[in-house]
UniProtKB/Swiss-Prot annotation:
The chain crosses the membrane at residues 23-43, 52-72, 97-117, 120-140, 144-164, 202-222, 238-258, 303-323, 348-368, 391-411, 447-467, 475-495. Belongs to the NhaB Na(+)/H(+) (TC 2.A.34) antiporter family. This is Na(+)/H(+) antiporter NhaB. InterPro entries: Na+/H+_antiporter_NhaB. Disulfide bonds: none annotated. It catalyses: 2 Na(+)(in) + 3 H(+)(out) = 2 Na(+)(out) + 3 H(+)(in). PANTHER family: NA(+)_H(+) ANTIPORTER NHAB, TRANSPORTER ARSB-RELATED. GO terms for cellular component: plasma membrane. It comes from Escherichia coli O6:K15:H31 (strain 536 / UPEC). Na(+)/H(+) antiporter that extrudes sodium in exchange for external protons. NCBIfam families: NhaB, PRK09547.1.
């Protein structure tokens, strides 16, 4: 029997999301206008809480949908205006260009990145050294490329290798269902479980590596670009400004990587089974023998484009998004990708998040119009200049560990800039606060997948169920990194940031604008 019109509408609304989630969103949409009539300030904070809730529930429904509905209603009832949203989007055009073009550009360099990580995995036998290599490689790549892309590449390598061994273990050459272990005998299952543990630890090291590298440069994370633009910093300025905090954090993060592997804490320490290594090595040898001259030229071209990318970013030859567009043009032209649909695939990863970011800016417009963060900022600014740095770092860290970094970073840098323009803080203090905001937004956010987009991407990928990587297990495995990165970052903001920045100024390496 066919379902009723009402039931059909209910099923279509937010698709496969749970009924309680759909009901919660409908309640939000009904309650918000009523509370706005009574107290716009309370309604504004309620909207922010609801939006953070949609981000935290990203596994139930992509936040663009519920967040977008809340943002549309906010504009309709007068919490902000469509004109103000347009101004926020225009002010952050560089970030949108970064997401649209840079992420798509790196898509056409995936073959090179796959080659790099495959070589690392098979050529380094020591698990401690391999983990460190994955962490360092992910950190270095994330300093120049998009973290999501780096994680996507590592996921591709892991899924590929898992599939190769799964087919051998199940004794079926055409093994398409990688989640079906029913055809695998007991001995192979033990080895497969060990292999899963090995891949889990590598993925977590790589994920944390993207956070360690991503915080260091203005292109490492989208919010970095927003903060750099607000402070008027270019690539080199940003790197030097952050280094009093980010360099010690990087060193301690890498030491943590070695420590958890050595002591086999928090689910780390599993080695690559020798049987699996033999199978993977055999497959890699076969692939190398089949590689044509055309394939080799593609890898060489992608490496040259990588050099161009790093050089163009370091010398600030153009806006970041435009450099990404140049990568798309060069990579497609010189590797023979000419089909419109093949080029279009590169944009599928970034455009949903670009749309979500536009919704962020709508909520930011509400925050500005309703002056929601004014009491918090006033509280922080009443403290001494030295204490302000730690307070900004802590408030950013708490919010960014459960919400999206771009959202949090944008809110706080806007408030700090407004305080500077009103004369509440000096330009010099504002620049130090920008560092505290950036590091506070990036470092503690490794605590949960909600905070790090790369972690969320890993959790929702096809790989996660294969290697038994759940939300809880990810939080547990991230815990040692969360503690070390957060505490070392806080200590550096407290004790090294101001004196080292002052020394850089005396040396003439940086200057207050």
């Amino acid at each position: 029997m066919e379902i009723s019109w009402g039931r059909a509408l209910w099923r279509n609304f937010l698709g496969q999301s749970p009924d309680w989630y759909k009901l919660a969103l409908i309640i939000f949409l009904i309650v918000n206008p009523l509370i706005f009539l009574i107290s716009p300030f309370v309604a504004g904070w309620l909207l922010v809480a609801e939006f953070i809730f949609t981000l935290a529930m990203a596994l139930k429904c992509y936040p663009l949908l519920p967040g977008g509905l809340l943002a549309i209603e906010a504009v309709f009832i007068g919490m902000t205006s469509a004109e103000h949203v347009r101004e926020e989007v225009a002010a952050n055009l560089e970030v949108l260009l970064l997401l649209m073009f840079m992420v798509a550009g790196i898509y056409f360099m995936k073959q090179l990145l796959l080659f790099i990580f495959t070589r690392l995995l098979l050529s380094i036998r020591s698990k401690m050294l391999l983990s460190l290599s994955f962490c360092v490689a992910a950190a270095f790549l994330s300093a120049f490329l998009d973290a999501l892309t780096v994680v996507a590449v590592v996921i591709s390598v892991a899924v590929g290798f898992y599939g190769i061994y799964h087919r051998v273990a199940s004794s079926r050459a055409e093994d398409t269902d990688l989640q079906d272990d029913s055809h695998i005998d007991k001995h192979y299952k033990v080895v497969l479980e060990q292999f899963r543990g090995f891949l889990r630890s590598l993925m977590m090291h790589a994920g944390v590596g993207t956070a360690l590298g991503g915080v260091m440069t203005m292109v490492g994370e989208p919010q970095n670009l927003i903060i750099a633009k607000a402070a008027g910093w270019h690539f080199g300025d940003f790197f030097l400004r952050m280094s009093p905090v980010t360099v010690p954090v990087l060193i301690c993060g890498l030491l943590t990587c070695l420590l958890v592997e050595k002591l086999r804490w928090f689910g780390y320490g599993e080695t690559l089974p020798e049987k699996v290594r033999e199978v993977l090595q055999q497959f890699d040898d076969q692939s190398r023998n089949q590689r044509t001259r055309q394939d080799k030229i593609r890898l060489i071209v992608q490496a040259i484009i990588g050099v161009w990318l790093v050089t163009a970013l370091a010398l600030h030859l153009a806006e970041v998004g435009l450099i990404g567009l140049s990568v798309i043009i060069l990579a497609t032209s010189l590797t023979g990708v000419t089909d419109e649909h093949a080029i279009g695939k590169a944009f599928t990863e970034s455009l949903p998040f670009t749309a979500l970011l536009t919704v962020f800016f709508s909520v930011v417009a509400v925050i500005i119009d309703q002056q929601l963060f004014s009491p918090i900022i006033q509280f922080v600014l009443q403290a001494s200049e030295h204490a302000q740095l730690s307070l900004f770092y802590i408030f950013n860290g708490l919010l960014s560990s459960i919400s999206d970094n771009v959202f949090v970073g944008t809110i706080y840098i806007n408030e700090a800039k407004a305080a500077m323009e009103s004369g509440a803080i000096t330009l010099k203090q504002y620049e130090l606060l920008a560092v505290a905001i950036n590091t506070g937004t990036n470092l503690p956010s490794v605590a949960t997948p909600n905070g790090q987009a790369a972690f969320l991407f890993l959790l929702t990928s096809a790989l996660a169920p294969l290697i038994r990587l759940s939300y809880g297990r990810m939080v547990w495995m991230a815990l040692p990194y969360t503690l070390v990165l957060t505490l070392v970052g806080l200590l550096c903001v407290e004790f090294t940031l101001a004196p080292v920045t002052e020394w850089f100024m005396q040396m003439g390496w940086i200057a207050t604008l």
